[in-house]
C-alpha cells in the first residue's frame, strides 16, 4: 500500500489505440488524478466513470489531468470507454502490473459480495441504468479499485484504497476537498478549503 508523499510507480501502459504511454508524462506538466477500475461488468466502476466524465470540466479547470487504468486489452478498453467514459484518457493494463505496483490487491468475499454496503450500492447503480454483468474473460472479478492524486514531482499526495468495491470517493470529495487543496506544495493535510492543521 502506497502512502502520502511516496514516489508514484512509473510504468508504460497502452492507450486504446495501442500506443505506449509512460505515466510520468501525464503528471510531468500538471497533477494527475489516476483512477483504477475493477472489471468491465462492475456497476460501481461504471458509476465512478460517469461521475468523472460529469466532473471532468471542473477537475481540469482546477488544474488536474485525468487518467483511468483498466484490466482490459486496448481493444476491449476502447469499446468499454466509448460507452462509459467518453473523452477520458483510458489505459490498458491487462497484466495488472500497475495494479500490483500501486498496491491494489484482490478483495475478499466480504469486500466484493457479502457486504450490505455493496448490495445497496448495486441497487442504486441499477436504478441509474448501470447493470451488473460478469467480468469479461481475463479480468479478475475480485480486483479492487483505487484512486490517486500525483503531483508534478511524481509524489502521491492522495492515495485512496477502497474498503469495499462500492467505496469509491464521491465527486464532492474530489471537487470540494481534493481540488481546493494546493497540490503544488508538499501535502501535510488536511484537505479542503479553510481546513486547519492540528497543532503538534
Language model: regions and residue ranges:
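Short active-site neighborhood of thiol/selenol oxidoreductases, capturing the structured segment around
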Residues: 23-52, 65
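Short beta-strand/turn micro-motifs composed of small residues
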Residues: 37, 70, 151
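A short, polar/charged loop-to-alpha-helix boundary motif
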Residues: 165-181
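Thiol/selenol-based redox catalytic cores and closely related redox-interacting motifs
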Residues: 81, 88-89, 93-166
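Cysteine/selenocysteine-centered motifs that mediate thiol-based redox chemistry or coordinate metal-sulfur cofactors
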Residues: 184-200
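Domain-level signature for proteins that mediate thiol-based redox and metal-cofactor handling
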Residues: 4, 10, 19, 56, ...
Amino acid at each position: 500500500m502506497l502512502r502520502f508523499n511516496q514516489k508514484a510507480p512509473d510504468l508504460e501502459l497502452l492507450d486504446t489505440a495501442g500506443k505506449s504511454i509512460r505515466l510520468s508524462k501525464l503528471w510531468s506538466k500538471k497533477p494527475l488524478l489516476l483512477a483504477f477500475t475493477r472489471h468491465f461488468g462492475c456497476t460501481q466502476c461504471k458509476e465512478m466513470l460517469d461521475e468523472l466524465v460529469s466532473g471532468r470540466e471542473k477537475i481540469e479547470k482546477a488544474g488536474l489531468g485525468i487518467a483511468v487504468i483498466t484490466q482490459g486489452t486496448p481493444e476491449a478498453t476502447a469499446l468499454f470507454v466509448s460507452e462509459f467514459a467518453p473523452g477520458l484518457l483510458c489505459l490498458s493494463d491487462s497484466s495488472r502490473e500497475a495494479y500490483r505496483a500501486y498496491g491494489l490487491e484482490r478483495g475478499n468475499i466480504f469486500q466484493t459480495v457479502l457486504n450490505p454496503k455493496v448490495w445497496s450500492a448495486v441497487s442504486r447503480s441499477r436504478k441509474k441504468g448501470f447493470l451488473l454483468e460478469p467480468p469479461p474473460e481475463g479480468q479478475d472479478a475480485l480486483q479492487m479499485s483505487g484512486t490517486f492524486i500525483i503531483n508534478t514531482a511524481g509524489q502521491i499526495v492522495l492515495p485512496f484504497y477502497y474498503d469495499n468495491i462500492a467505496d469509491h470517493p464521491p465527486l464532492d470529495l474530489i471537487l470540494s476537498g481534493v481540488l481546493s487543496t494546493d497540490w503544488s506544495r508538499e501535502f501535510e493535510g488536511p484537505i479542503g478549503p479553510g481546513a486547519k492543521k492540528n497543532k503538534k
